[in-house]
Amino acid sequence: MRQILIAPDSFKGTLSAGEVCQIALDVLAPEFDCVAHPLADGGEGTLEAIANNLDGQWQTVRVQGPLPDQTVDACYLWLPQEETAVIEMARASGLPLVPVGEHNPEIATSYGTGELITHAARRGAKQIQLAIGGSATNDAGLGLLMALGWQFLDSQGQSVGWGGQALGKVAEIIPPVLNAFPQVTVLCDVTNPFYGANGAAQVYAPQKGADPAMVQRLDQGLRHFARVVREFDGFEINFPRAGAAGGMGGGVAWALETKIESGFTAIAKLTQLEQAMAGCDLVITGEGCFDHQSPQGKVVGGVLELAKKINKPAIIVAGQCQLSQTVLPNVLKIFSLVGPDMPLEKALQHPQTALKKRLVQVKQYLIQSQN
C-alpha cells in the first residue's frame, strides 16, 4: 500500500489546513495509508498547523490589545519538549481585534505581543518563534520592546508613549538588562524595507486605516527612528524584511538580535516536514489559489521544492489553479476545486463538498495509475 503525506496550506477563508487533512484522510482511506501534516507560512493558521504536528500546550494570557484602552485574551503555543514558544503577533496586536471604524496605526501598539514574549520567557522558553503577519500596528515594535523593559524617551526625558505617533518623538533609548533571554526567530515572508516607497508605512499603513497624510507622518517617523538607532549603536535598520508588521521586523532584529526566516522554512523545520516526507511515496499539497506567487516562498512552493529535492512525486489540489503542471517538475497532476461541474460561488459556499469531490477523483487517478 502506498503511503501518502497530506501537507497542505489552509484554503484561505474556507478551510483550515487541519480540515483539509481530515477530509483527505476520510476520502483516501482505507485504500491508501495517509499521514496528515498541515502547514502554514507564518500567517493565518500557524499555531494550529504546529499544534497538529507537535505535542503542544495552549497558553492563554490577558494582555494589552492593539488599542490603548483594550485588553484581549491571547493564546500562544508552548512546546515543552522543544522548550519553544510559538507566538502569533495577530493574537495580541492584530488588525481583526480592532473594531470597525477604529483602525489607526498612529495609536495601535504591539505592547501585548511583548507581554506574550515575557510570559513565555518566564515559563522557561529557550526559543521563541514569532509570526508577525496580520498586525494592526506601525510602531516598529516599540510597544513590544517597552513590554520587555526598553525605554524610549523624548527630548524632555518623558516616555514617547504608544503607537506609530511615538516614532518621531524618540530622542533617547535606554535598553534593559536582559539576562539569558530566549533566542527569538521572526517568521516573515514579505521583503519590504523599513521606510520609503516600498516600506512599512507606504505599503501597509493604508490597509490599517491610515489616510495619505498619516502615511507620510508614519514614514517620517520610521525615518527618524532609523536615524536615532543609527546614532545609538550604528545599526542600519532599513534592510529587506525590516518593514514587516509596521516595522516590527526591523525593530526586533535590531533590539533582540533576532533571526528573520521564511515562515514556511521555520515551520517545516520545526515540524520535521522533510523527515515525514522521506517516509512516504507521494505528497499531496494544496491551497486556496495556486498561482505564479505560489512557488515563491509560499507553502505549496516550499513543499514542491522539498519533494523535488528528495525525489518524491506530488499532486496539487487547489481551490483554483492558474499554473500549468508542465512548468512544475515532479508534479503528477493538478486538481482544481473550481471547474465546469463546480462553479466558484458553489465551491466557496460548500468547500467541504467541493474538496471531497476532487479528492474522490484523486483517489480514482491513483488507483488507475497503480494498475
From Swiss-Prot:
Signal peptide: none annotated. GO terms for molecular function: glycerate 2-kinase activity; glycerate kinase activity. Keywords: Kinase, Transferase. It comes from the Bacteria. Disulfide bonds: none annotated. GO terms for biological process: organic acid phosphorylation. InterPro entries: Glyc_kinase_flavodox-like_fold, Glycerate_kinase, Glycerate_kinase_RE-like, Glycerate_kinase_sf. PANTHER family: GLYCERATE KINASE (PTHR21599:SF0). Belongs to the glycerate kinase type-1 family. NCBIfam families: glycerate kinase (TIGR00045). This is Uncharacterized protein slr1840.
